[in-house]
Amino acid sequence: MAPLGSSTVFLLALTIIASTRALTPTHYLTKHDVERLKASLDRPFTNLESAFYSIVGLSSLGAQVPDAKKACTYIRSNLDPSNVDSLFYAAQASQALSGCEISISNETKDLLLAAVSEDSSVTQIYHAVAALSGFGLPLASQEALSALTARLSKEETVLATVQALQTASHLSQQADLRSIVEEIEDLVARLDELGGVYLQFEEGLETTALFVAATYKLMDHVGTEPSIKEDQVIQLMNAIFSKKNFESLSEAFSVASVAAVLSHNRYHVPVVVVPEGSASDTHEQAILRLQVTNVLSQPLTQATVKLEHAKSVASRATVLQKTSFTPVGDVFELNFMNVKFSSGYYDFLVKVEGDNRYIANTVELRVKISTEVGITNVDLSTVDKDQSIAPKTTRVTYPAKAKGTFIADSHQNFALFFQLVDVNTGAELTPHQTFVRLHNQKTGQEVVFVAEPDSKNVYKFELDTSERKIEFDSASGTYTLYLIIGDATLKNPILWNVADVVIKFPEEEAPSTVLSQNLFTPKQEIQHLFREPEKRPPTVVSNTFTALILSPLLLLFALWIRIGANVSNFTFTPSTIIFHLGHAAMLGLMYVYWTQLNMFQTLKYLAILGSVTFLAGNRMLAQQAVKRTAH
């Protein structure tokens, strides 16, 4: 352990806690997530639609497909000039590729213009308008807007409204787009909030992401701030980026699109503040490093980062305020070596400025500042109970073990005194865990006591054998005394073998056998006492009762033998066979009811069997009556 007066050592553990001022992003795209998203988009083309998702999605992330010329050739060869959807995918994908131009005939142009009609679906209108825009062809925006508005009144789904927003972003700014812009507020009202952290449509992640991307693209186009609150933007962001693996290309494309617009738009840019590992664990410096990025983990190097204040969690006292972070490469650093922080937890309120578009730019970090504990003024004493002899005191220095042994018996007590200090500052410490453990060297018995500080923060442990005999089970012997010190803010928890103490209890109180009190020994098996079975009647009684139950059956057989059973009239007609089988089945059902079924199940089966048996019996008796009449 470092001696007193050595250089300061700080160990910081950083956690982002919920700020009372605003929501903070809980989900965003880390650099690893961005690469995984790119990998999800970079797939072989299976059709023109997949090529669109892959090319435009990668372009949103600032990447390109591996072979742009090959991709352009694929688009040209798979384009169907008579299909509006095919033209849309080709136009948008070719725009994302440099030097990829696609020529369009007049017939194709007329096809696209004809699709911009209220007789077409919203999807068809969107694809036609976007294709015309992508190919650089002229379009009557006001007429397209009228067709879109008329069709939207018939399709009131969330996806149709989102596609209307996407369509409007391709129309001229001179057109009156207010009716479409007003749909944004209606869509926001239809969002579902989950736990105050997430906001999404019940249609799922893809629709939610397309809505956010379309909203900001349209608002950038018309030059109006979207009617979405900053907290709602963060909730939408948390919902969209909470998913890291994507089932389809379209889903990955939607996430890439929203990541692009939230990173670069004219109104709202969410800020992500992430601590970079832990602070420097050295004797020379204590530095808090923060990564300040957008949702794509791209550094906001032009930002300014300030510490508003740092408060102790325990006392709420402000220990540091109004301090700027220093930009170093892609991170921001705060060196607070010169500030006298005592060990404990602190809340650092950090604010990111430099752009009025920043949202979620105030974050609160919980910082744990650890230190090293030192043990000083350690005195071991034996004190005579009658005080006729002066106490014998031995001072010991950590981590050495005291020489010799100390005795505690009916005539003298044993006492331990010590103080705990901060090695770095010399201030007194009161850790959460300060224990004295006594371990019997022969039996393995362990007894643990809590050492408490007095008003002067001097820890004292006194062993009086007359008062502590219950804890020790009056087991005399040589005990090893350990001092245990621990705390979440201590860098060097201590387990110190301080001394050997001989403890003597009066012999008449000592147990004949000493059971180990080791906490880790197997416990004695618990013997359960179950209720004794009830007495049963004698075998004679049970046999007699069984015979009485069977007596009617025996009587039936006896009468049949005496009178004679008339089986000559038995006929093998279906009704006769079904009747007797049904009767036998009902008797069998009674047995099953007794062993397995409940009353309601039995009644259900009995209704079926009874109906069949009744009908068969009625038919059988009718046949017998006809037979008698004939004779």
Swiss-Prot record:
Pathway: Protein modification; protein glycosylation. It holds the Pfam family Ribophorin_II_2nd. It is a multi-pass membrane protein. Glycans are attached at residue 106. Residues 23-540, 598-604 are lumenal. The keyword Cell wall biogenesis/degradation does not apply. The keyword Transmembrane helix applies. This is Dolichyl-diphosphooligosaccharide--protein glycosyltransferase subunit 2. It comes from the Eukaryota. InterPro entries: Ribophorin_II_2nd, Ribophorin_II_3rd, Ribophorin_II_C, Ribophorin_II_N, Swp1. GO terms for cellular component: oligosaccharyltransferase complex. Belongs to the SWP1 family. Keywords: Endoplasmic reticulum, Glycoprotein, Isopeptide bond, Membrane, Signal, Transmembrane, Transmembrane helix, Ubl conjugation. GO terms for biological process: protein N-linked glycosylation. It is found in: Endoplasmic reticulum; Endoplasmic reticulum membrane. Residues 562-576, 618-631 are cytoplasmic. Subunit of the oligosaccharyl transferase (OST) complex that catalyzes the initial transfer of a defined glycan (Glc(3)Man(9)GlcNAc(2) in eukaryotes) from the lipid carrier dolichol-pyrophosphate to an asparagine residue within an Asn-X-Ser/Thr consensus motif in nascent polypeptide chains, the first step in protein N-glycosylation. N-glycosylation occurs cotranslationally and the complex associates with the Sec61 complex at the channel-forming translocon complex that mediates protein translocation across the endoplasmic reticulum (ER). All subunits are required for a maximal enzyme activity. Component of the oligosaccharyltransferase (OST) complex. OST exists in two different complex forms which contain common core subunits RPN1, RPN2, OST48, OST4, DAD1 and TMEM258, either STT3A or STT3B as catalytic subunits, and form-specific accessory subunits. STT3A complex assembly occurs through the formation of 3 subcomplexes. Subcomplex 1 contains RPN1 and TMEM258, subcomplex 2 contains the STT3A-specific subunits STT3A, DC2/OSTC, and KCP2 as well as the core subunit OST4, and subcomplex 3 contains RPN2, DAD1, and OST48. The chain crosses the membrane at residues 541-561, 577-597, 605-617. Residues 1-22 form the signal peptide. There is a cross-link at residue 154 (Glycyl lysine isopeptide (Lys-Gly) (interchain with G-Cter in ubiquitin)).
